[in-house]
Amino acid sequence: MSMTDNVADMLTRIRNAYKSKLISVSFPSSKIKTSILDVLQKEGYIKDYITTQKNNISYTEVALKYSVNGDASICEIHRVSKPGKRVYSAIKDLKGYYNNMGIYILSTPYGVMSDREAHIKNVGGEVICKVF
């Protein structure tokens, strides 16, 4: 079965794993997925992730993060820019998501980064997803 949107598949797997209270989730690996996971880890939404090779296919396993009382660190995670409709934004047009409690993840000429980092570097780009 071929997927047309690998990033949306990854986000859906993470969202469903949090709803099921799983400790970890795995999916096929790619460079863009790894870049998004780097941002999520840096922002404190996931614990860690590792990439493993199995039958010549790379898989990424993500260790999910929960609070002390068992609440998920990610309440919402949604794809913004889709293969059929790309969404680009200048940095001045990106306002804080959920009053700066959430983040946008952007693909910029300087790599994949959060909206906070993009504000510091004063660069816009494709809005991949939003996380709260």
UniProtKB/Swiss-Prot annotation:
Query: Which Gene Ontology MF annotations are present?
Result: rRNA binding; structural constituent of ribosome
Q: Which UniProt keywords apply?
A: Ribonucleoprotein, Ribosomal protein, RNA-binding, rRNA-binding
Keyword field contains Lipid metabolism: no
The parts of the chain that form a coiled coil are: none
What's one GO BP annotation on this UniProt entry?
Answer: translation
Can you tell which superkingdom this protein's organism belongs to?
Bacteria
What PROSITE patterns does the record point to? Answer: RIBOSOMAL_S8 (PS00053)
InterPro entries cross-referenced by the UniProt entry: Ribosomal_uS8 (IPR000630), Ribosomal_uS8_CS (IPR047863), Ribosomal_uS8_sf (IPR035987)
A Pfam family hit: Ribosomal_S8
The record, for Gene3D superfamilies, names: 3.30.1370.30, 3.30.1490.10
GO cellular component: a single term: ribosome
For this chain, the family text in UniProt reads: Belongs to the universal ribosomal protein uS8 family.
Q: How does it assemble?
A: Part of the 30S ribosomal subunit. Contacts proteins S5 and S12.
Q: What does this protein do?
A: One of the primary rRNA binding proteins, it binds directly to 16S rRNA central domain where it helps coordinate assembly of the platform of the 30S subunit.
Q: What is this protein called?
A: Small ribosomal subunit protein uS8
Q: What is the lineage of its organism?
A: Bacteria, Pseudomonadati, Pseudomonadota, Alphaproteobacteria, Rickettsiales
The encoding gene: rpsH
